[in-house]
Amino acid sequence: MSQASSSPGEGPSSEAAAISEAEAASGSFGRLHCQVLRLITNVEGGSLEAGRLRLLDLRTNIEVSRPSVLCCFQENKSPHDTVDLTDLNIKGRCVVGEQDRLLVDLNNFGPRRLTPGSENNTVSVLAFALPLDRVPVSGLHLFQSQRRGGEENRPRMEARAIIRRTAHHWAVRLTVTPNWRRRTDSSLEAGQIFVSQFAFRAGAIPLTLVDALEQLACSDPNTYIHKTETDERGQWIMLFLHHDSPHPPTSVFLHFSVYTHRAEVVARHNPYPHLRRLPDNGFQLLIPKSFTLTRIHPEYIVQIQNAFETNQTHDTIFFPENIPGVSIEAGPLPDRVRITLRVTLTGDQAVHLEHRQPLGRIHFFRRGFWTLTPGKPDKIKRPQVQLRAGLFPRSNVMRGAVSEFLPQSPGLPPTEEEEEEEEEDDEDDLSSTPTPTPLSEAMFAGFEEASGDEDSDTQAGLSPALILTGQRRRSGNNGALTLVIPSWHVFASLDDLVPLTVSVQHAALRPTSYLRSDMDGDVRTAADISSTLRSVPAPRPSPISTASTSSTPRSRPRI
């Protein structure tokens, strides 16, 4: 793109030429179509002290034609770059929807103040969209227990149930007098939970065919079914109840249905109350206990006493909310491992997060969308401030040339394998099998056969221009670019991403701004774009602490 130049001796004609050139540039940047957007921007519109945080407005909007996860990560320009914190560090942004304005946290971890005219004030980000296909999930799965000692170990408490067959499920109504036991749990707001368990005869319900249960009604609003199991002989259904108020009821009426679901993903326990089901794919994660992040206590670990099991058919990914001044772990969640997320303060002021405040979303991606990077032991999650993305040739990725994460400090949290879930229900000594036969065998084969149809459905409703952008197959071409997320040890094909429609605001353009196209238009680069700094909005007031008034710059957070 030609650059506009002027000299003191030139008259109004040169100014008119510059204006017309700016208008032409605005038109070319107004509506771009691509799979991945690379945005190279110069930080302007204010200064940023060393060790401080401000919001960076990239003045760019992205849109997609279907609900997706819209991501904006700092770019790794070389396969040898680590995901350590940089002097100018951008926190990864993830938004679920169909459009987003790119507004990210910018931390100055360098030793010097950043001003508009200073050197090294250029940052580069990659924006892309991840598809959200419909994934059925069983909230209350009927696990088959393996009891020690046989029938005599069945729970002593029994309940009489009224069972009726309907068109598509078995309706069960029963009244039980629970034998409540109090159990302490520091991860909950109340610090305790009341638990009870009982069993009822399945009667005519074919326990070898049904695999799911749905609670329809309960006489007490604070009581819910936490877990369900069947015995080895297929004669009993066991229910584990939880009550989260200080005064549990003496009698509980339950109405629920038992049916055959054969879902591709199951939850180990009832998602309620800290996982809110989303319509087609995933759950919204709610904070189980309020907490405050301060400069004295900058970290907190959120624990959800639940896990998911996919039988290797899906990857479970957690995408955190965009809370200014807070970095939350994001990335893959391993199967059958309790959900633990480290939350870290990265800003200057204390931040208070309320009980049941949304912390992020959990979504599921079909097997094969994410590929483990060669040479890496497993997929991992990392804090938002360490989310990086890169575009590298497939040959380099398959050769294992992408650098591994280098720890910033020796005090790292334990790995997920060390936190393998130990069935936290102390009320029983049961061990559950992963899944019944209908899910582990019949459903897996059906999923494999339907994968081709799901790929074709992802193009439905797209404009011809967007379809052409995403249909250029590059299989077998080792020089083709792939999207690598080194923070998670994964990479993905550009063809599997949702096409983007990008518009850069006219105010962000400079006379030297230019566009570049790679991979037949699948990758568009908008370079020399102007971005502005904004103040961080005041955090939610904390009931136990106030905003820090110290003038000491904040050091790099321990991650």
UniProtKB/Swiss-Prot annotation:
The modification S-nitrosocysteine is found at residue 218. S-nitrosylation limits ability to undermine the cGAS/STING antiviral pathway. Residues 415-430 have a biased composition (Acidic residues). Its main location: virion. Pfam families: Herpes_UL82_83. It is found in: Virion tegument; Host nucleus; Host endoplasmic reticulum. The modification Phosphothreonine is found at residue 223. One of its GO terms (biological process) is symbiont-mediated perturbation of host cell cycle G1/S transition checkpoint. It comes from the Viruses. GO terms for cellular component: host cell endoplasmic reticulum; host cell nucleus; viral tegument. Residues 431-440, 543-559 have a biased composition (Low complexity). Changing residue 218 to S: Increased inhibition of STING1-mediated antiviral response. Keywords: Activator, G1/S host cell cycle checkpoint dysregulation by virus, Host endoplasmic reticulum, Host nucleus, Host-virus interaction, Inhibition of host innate immune response by virus, Modulation of host cell cycle by virus, Phosphoprotein, S-nitrosylation, Viral immunoevasion, Virion, Virion tegument. Residues 404-440, 530-559 are annotated as: Disordered. Interacts with the host protein DAXX; this interaction takes place at ND10 and induces the reversal of DAXX-mediated repression of viral transcription. Interacts with UL35. Interacts with host TMEM173/STING1; this interaction inhibits the cGAS/STING pathway. Interacts with host RB1; this interaction mediates RB1 proteasomal degradation. Belongs to the herpesviridae pp71 family. Stimulates viral immediate-early (IE) transcription. Plays a role in the inhibition of the host innate repsonse by targeting STING1 and thus the cGAS-STING pathway. Also counteracts host DAXX-mediated repression of viral transcription. Displaces a DAXX-binding protein, ATRX, from nuclear domain 10 sites (ND10) shortly after infection. Increases the basal level of SUMOylated DAXX in infected cells. Stimulates quiescent cells to re-enter the cell cycle, proceed through G1 and enter the S phase. This is Protein pp71. It comes from Human cytomegalovirus (strain AD169) (HHV-5).
